[in-house]
A protein has these predicted regions:
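Acidic, low-complexity intrinsically disordered segments
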Residues: 1-224
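Structural recognition of alpha->loop->beta junctions
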Residues: 122-142, 278-287, 351-366
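Flexible glycine/acidic-rich beta-alpha junction loops that bind and position SAM and/or redox cofactors
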Residues: 13-17, 23, 116-121, 234, ...
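Radical SAM enzyme core and accessory elements
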Residues: 2-21, 70-80, 382, 400-583
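Conserved beta-strand positions
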Residues: 6, 83, 111, 230-232, ...
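Radical SAM [4Fe-4S] cluster-binding motif and immediate context
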Residues: 163-334, 339-341, 347, 351-354
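Residue-level detector of anion-binding/catalytic polar loops
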Residues: 57, 108, 285, 332, ...
Length: 583
């Protein structure tokens, strides 16, 4: 039997010495929200997808130390060692390759992941890190071909992620499933790594039936499953697939719309093809929308009837209407916005920021432009190629310097990013509050609807969400960032109790518990950030997968090293933009 070792790059480096690189809630989606900043545990899903779709005895390592990686190399006679990496990890790859050659010389080294865009040709790849094979596309079919295995449908039964308030639990329960619908995007945004990786093509991984079966699996094995993330850079662009999946979800006899929902990505141009109620009936719970900038000319930010022309005011009014319409039905949003685009300058940046705040996204990603040296945008910004680049690989993340701005210094870009996160918290409140408001909108809308699936199934779904999230309201009412937000929380608590009744004894005890824990955390940290928390190491064992029972997890977790806090190596106080006015 073939033996394969899969591994992420060792010891992910904290971003700006402030956040764990794998904690997307802390460093981007709920960043800067004081004690209401969430903490996420995530998984290296691409490697899990590979391990559970080949006929091999496999071990998969998530975020080991170099010592743990070397110990695993020495523990067995591996046939293949597969290492997944991103651009910022490239300096660590040679050390891992050297360890394989030294400790397991018979093994073939396979490298892959989005970091391969930094290795534009075979010679450059060999100079960067020793390897035998490099995957530059969809990994499952690549690996099966390498191992001499026949093709068959891809299964997707990945470990579940989750997010929580870190002062409430040491580790969040896994409640969010994941399903990979496709790689790549046909929009070809100039800064988009995933589109460049697939040369602007869409590489389907799971068809509609595969997505549906993956969603059922997560609910079958875990009654606490809340939603499933469908990964496809613009899933909503493919209306036939969205409608077909929605039909399966609505007609499902076990779970239906009372339980089945998903997060995915959708451009403004894609969303414009739907009536918002269609999306609700199709199971959409949360959508990531790339706003990017008030002044961008990207076609993906325009409605279907705006593709042939560009009127910025009209386009951005459409954007605001889209966010409002989605929120009014209970569909949550993640809005992404980029600082440092060449359409921004010192004169227009306040208007750009104001526009994004007014969209009131449920969650937000506010990033700095990343200029990849191997992509065409690298030539435009004159940053050198992958081997003559001006900036170190460790900078290649959402907040690292990868180009020289023209209208701002790079520190000013970071200041404005921090300031905008802070402003959104002050003016819009914590994302937990925005999410609850949105779910309450969904409940009201569905209860009024004439459509039976909305009035019965989806209203039940939203009621469960509101009841589950409402216990945080006393903490927001007491410790929110300002009187306006605290007042909103009290009013929302009153509305919830009018709809669903006063909390029962057990609920009151839990609300009081949350408030006491929140007060203790606020006394300890105020509005400051928590120390960096190191990424958890986990070792998974997989066997041959073709006959693996569908209703059971296809892996065993055989060893863990829990996350732990570490001292910051350099002081990194939260930046504040001078222009932020706190109401």
């Amino acid at each position: 039997m073939t033996r394969v070792l899969f591994s992420t790059v060792y010891d992910p480096e904290p971003l700006l010495e402030r956040w764990a690189a794998t904690d997307q809630m802390a460093y981007r989606l709920t960043r800067g929200q004081g004690i209401f900043t969430l903490e996420e545990h995530a998984h290296s899903w691409p490697l899990h997808l590979l391990a559970q779709n080949v006929e091999a005895d496999s071990v998969m390592l998530e975020w080991p130390s170099l010592e743990e990686f070397e110990a695993e190399l020495s523990a067995a006679d591996w046939d293949y060692v597969c290492i997944s990496f991103m651009n910022r990890d490239l300096d660590k790859l040679p050390l891992m390759s050297e360890a394989v050659r030294r400790l397991c010389p018979r093994a073939k080294i396979v490298i892959g992941g989005y970091g391969v865009i930094c290795l534009p040709d075979a010679e450059a790849a060999k100079r960067s890190a020793d390897h035998d094979f490099i995957c530059r596309g969809e990994g499952v079919h690549f690996l099966r071909k390498l191992l001499g295995e026949p093709d068959r449908p891809i299964q997707c039964r990945l470990p579940q992620s989750g997010a929580t308030l870190p002062w409430l639990a040491r580790r969040s329960r896994g409640t969010v499933g994941a399903a990979l619908a496709a790689l790549g995007c046909t929009q070809k945004c100039p800064f988009c790594v995933t589109s460049f990786y697939t040369k602007g093509n869409l590489l389907e991984v799971l068809n509609v039936r595969g997505l549906y079966e993956a969603m059922l699996y997560y609910h079958d094995v875990n009654p606490f499953t809340s939603t499933v993330n469908i990964y496809d850079e613009n899933f909503l662009d493919y209306k036939e697939r969205v409608d077909a999946l929605g039909q399966l979800l609505r007609d499902d006899g076990r779970y239906g719309l009372r339980n089945l929902s998903y997060f995915t990505f959708g451009s403004l141009s894609a969303i414009s093809r739907y009536d918002p109620e269609e999306l609700l009936l199709n199971g959409l719970d949360t959508v990531w929308i790339g706003v990017e900038s008030y002044f961008t000319r990207l076609k993906k930010t325009r409605g279907e009837n705006q593709q042939g022309r560009l009127d910025l005011d009209e386009r951005n009014a459409f954007t605001a209407d889209t966010f409002r319409a989605l929120h009014s039905l209970g569909i949550k949003t993640i809005g992404s916005w980029i600082m440092g685009l060449d359409c921004q300058d010192r004169v227009n940046i306040p208007r750009d920021e104001d526009h994004f705040v007014r969209l009131n996204p449920t969650f937000q990603q506010i990033s700095v432009l990343t200029v990849e040296p191997a992509m065409p945008i690298g030539r435009r910004y004159d940053v050198g190629d992958a081997e003559t680049r001006k900036y170190p690989w460790r900078n290649y993340h959402l907040y690292g310097q990868t180009f020289e701005p023209t209208d701002f210094t790079f520190d000013e870009l970071l200041d404005r990013v921090d300031g905008l996160y802070g402003r959104m918290y002050q003016e819009l409140g914590p994302s937990l509050l925005r999410m609850l408001e949105c779910n309450l909108n969904g409940y009201r809308y569905c209860r009024r609807s004439r459509h039976p699936r909305l009035r019965e199934d989806k209203a039940t779904f939203f009621e469960r969400r509101v009841r589950g999230q409402a216990p945080i309201l006393p903490a927001v009412a007491e410790l929110g960032p300002n009187p306006a937000i605290r007042g909103r929380a009290r009013e929302l608590d009153r509305e919830v109790q009018e709809l669903f009744g006063r909390p029962e004894e057990a609920q009151r005890v839990y609300r009081d518990h949350l408030l006491r824990k929140a007060e203790a955390e606020y006394q300890l940290r105020g509005e400051g950030e928590r120390p960096v928390r190191t990424d958890a190491f986990r070792r998974y064992e997989y066997g041959p997968q073709s006959s693996s029972p569908r209703d059971r997890k296809p892996y065993v977790v055989s060893r863990t090293r829990p996350r732990g806090y570490e001292e910051r190596r350099a002081a990194a106080p939260a930046r504040q933009a001078a222009a932020v006015a706190v109401p």
